[in-house]
């Protein structure tokens, strides 16, 4: 028979650097959702978890609680879905690469269920840029779900689906540090995608995030930490990769030079004061963007095509994505989504 631990006992365990088992992690998250943890304790828990480092067991167990609390208003479409949501937080001020990748991958035949939020930092988040380009983030939940069946892509705005976490936002902002909830964000897509490409801003997050995805029975996934600290695959050098395939984890590296493409500096991806996140995203989707922008989106799209089982060769996936952008197919996909969610 398991022993139910008090909040103080769990906190002490974390302060001593001891990992939580699945049951205790589950209990902790349920107490957060049920308002059974004082605000001062929440600050201590989040700080202690950050200092210790969350494990795959802790992350997957907490994510399960959040997913079970998030009920779909209609049945999940019987489709193989992929998410491109990452942890963010690289501080590089690049354009919205994973958002662009979602539309390019969808134009290449992948059913994309993109989970995302507004930015908590100075950078424009996926929800910010889509909202500014006219995507209706307040469409009915039923319409958001049916969109992936009708259009091949949808966007799930996190606060709409995980209302129970909104109450923690002021404290998280006051703490001023990245917490376990930044890691949980990519793991709690309400549509429970079959596969995912998940970018992390620190190589210390590679193993726990891959372990969490494996424990959550993700069919296929890639966790990537980009060269130079990007939370996307970079064009500049070696990118650290963990392939998750039916529970098996395989460490690898990928570099565009492997298929005879020239390395390009991460600086070419930075949004300057004269640039607009929205204009850059539009130019990428319609194929008129800068070469570095198109190439980095193509590289990351190739990873999505791999997890989706559409293209097992990264170089071929890279070229497939470039071709789709050259035909403005991702922009057409964007317009379809915009019109569908408006109607």
UniProtKB/Swiss-Prot annotation:
HAMAP family linked to this entry: TrpD
Residues reported in the UniProt entry to bind anthranilate 2: 172
Catalytic activity: N-(5-phospho-beta-D-ribosyl)anthranilate + diphosphate = 5-phospho-alpha-D-ribose 1-diphosphate + anthranilate
Pathway(s) the chain acts in: Amino-acid biosynthesis; L-tryptophan biosynthesis; L-tryptophan from chorismate: step 2/5
Cross-referenced Pfam families: Glycos_trans_3N (PF02885), Glycos_transf_3 (PF00591)
Presence of keyword Iron-sulfur: no
Example GO biological process: L-tryptophan biosynthetic process
Binding site for Mg(2+) 2: 231-232
Protein name (database record): Anthranilate phosphoribosyltransferase
UniProt key word Aminoacyl-tRNA synthetase: no
Known role: Catalyzes the transfer of the phosphoribosyl group of 5-phosphorylribose-1-pyrophosphate (PRPP) to anthranilate to yield N-(5'-phosphoribosyl)-anthranilate (PRA).
Record note on cofactor: Binds 2 magnesium ions per monomer.
Residues that hold 5-phospho-alpha-D-ribose 1-diphosphate according to the record: 86, 89-90, 94, 96-99, 114-122, 126
Subunit (UniProt): Homodimer.
EC class of the enzyme, as a word: transferase
The protein's Enzyme Commission number: 2.4.2.18
Cofactor(s) needed: Mg(2+)
Binding-site list for Mg(2+) 1: 98, 232
Transmembrane segments: none
């Amino acid at each position: 028979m398991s022993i139910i631990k008090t909040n103080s006992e769990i906190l002490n365990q974390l302060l001593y650097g001891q990992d939580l088992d699945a049951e205790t992690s589950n209990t902790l998250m349920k107490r957060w959702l049920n308002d059974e943890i004082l605000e001062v304790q929440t600050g201590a828990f989040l700080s202690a978890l950050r200092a210790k480092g969350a494990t795959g067991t802790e992350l997957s167990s907490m994510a399960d609680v959040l997913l079970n609390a998030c009920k779909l208003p209609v049945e999940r479409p019987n489709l193989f879905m992929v998410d491109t949501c990452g942890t963010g937080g690289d501080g590089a001020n690049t354009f919205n690469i994973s958002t662009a990748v979602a539309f390019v991958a969808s134009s290449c035949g992948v059913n994309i269920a993109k989970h995302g939020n507004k930015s908590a930092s100075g950078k424009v988040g996926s929800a910010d840029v889509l909202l500014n380009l006219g995507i209706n983030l307040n469409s009915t939940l039923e319409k958001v779900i049916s969109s992936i069946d009708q259009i091949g892509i949808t966007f799930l705005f996190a606060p709409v689906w995980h209302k129970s976490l909104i109450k923690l936002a002021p404290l998280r902002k006051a703490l001023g540090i990245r917490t376990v909830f930044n890691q949980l964000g990519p793991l709690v897509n309400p549509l429970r995608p079959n596969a995912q490409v998940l970018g992390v801003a620190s190589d210390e997050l590679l193993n726990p995030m891959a372990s969490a995805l494996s424990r959550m029975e993700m069919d296929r996934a890639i966790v990537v930490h980009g060269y130079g600290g990007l939370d996307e695959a970079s064009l500049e050098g070696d990118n650290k990769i963990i392939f998750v395939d039916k529970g098996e984890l395989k460490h690898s590296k990928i570099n565009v030079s492997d298929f005879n493409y020239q390395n390009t500096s991460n600086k070419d991806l930075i949004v300057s004061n004269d640039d607009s996140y929205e204009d850059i995203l539009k130019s990428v989707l319609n194929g008129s963007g800068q070469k570095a922008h198109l190439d980095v989106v193509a590289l990351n799209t190739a990873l999505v095509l791999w997890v989706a089982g559409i293209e097992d060769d990264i170089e071929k996936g890279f070229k497939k994505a470039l071709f789709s952008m050259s035909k403005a197919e991702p922009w057409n996909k964007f317009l379809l989504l915009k019109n569908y969610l408006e109607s």
